[in-house]
Amino acid sequence: RSPSRGLGDVYKRQTNTRHNIGFKIIDAINLHFKLSKQKPKFKGLLTTGNIEEKKIYAIKPLTFMNNSGTAIKELIDYFKIDAKDVIVFHDDMDIDFGKIKAKFGGRSAGHNGIESIDKFIGKEYSRVRIGIGHPKQKKKVNNHVLEDFKEDEDCLLYTSDAADDLTR
């Protein structure tokens, strides 16, 4: 069993922002693998299904980013899943847009959603860091993260090949 988790923000006005890339990745995986319809559970929107005979639980927390660890904690406690089997998809400004880096464990690098998850389940889980690029000026960081994707950026997220690659 493998819970996947996408980090994002709950406000409708932030649906298409770079900060919500984790949610968009979960949506792409759900669509590509025809997982179940999202339903409210564990302080988030839960989708379940199988990918290559492996049970998948994908959740998009409906908490604020800073509290997103509560949703994953409730999910893994309920289904008795080890934290080491968790995969979290999240934005990373230190990586060029569209580039992906995966790692197991490690530090939060200042990402509030990751800090929240670390607090609730520890640091021993997989992270898939999706590059959103950096604005190069510190004062532009907040606007950059909360800006909507540009048209050419948005279309990159919904290719079936990307969903396939992210789940391997």
Task: Indicate where each model-derived feature is located.
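Nucleotide and nucleotide-moiety/phosphate-recognizing core
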Residues: R5, D9-F104, E115, K119, ...
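Charged/polar, solvent-exposed surface patches and flexible loops
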Residues: L31, E74, H144-D148, D164
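Phosphate-binding/catalytic loops
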Residues: K99-A109, I114-S160
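Single conserved hydrophobic/aromatic residue that forms the stacking wall/gate
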Residues: R1-L7, Y11, Y158-R168
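Charge-dense, low-complexity intrinsically disordered segments
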Residues: R1, N16, E151
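Anionic group-transfer/hydrolysis microenvironments
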Residues: L62, D92-D96, G131-G133, F149, ...
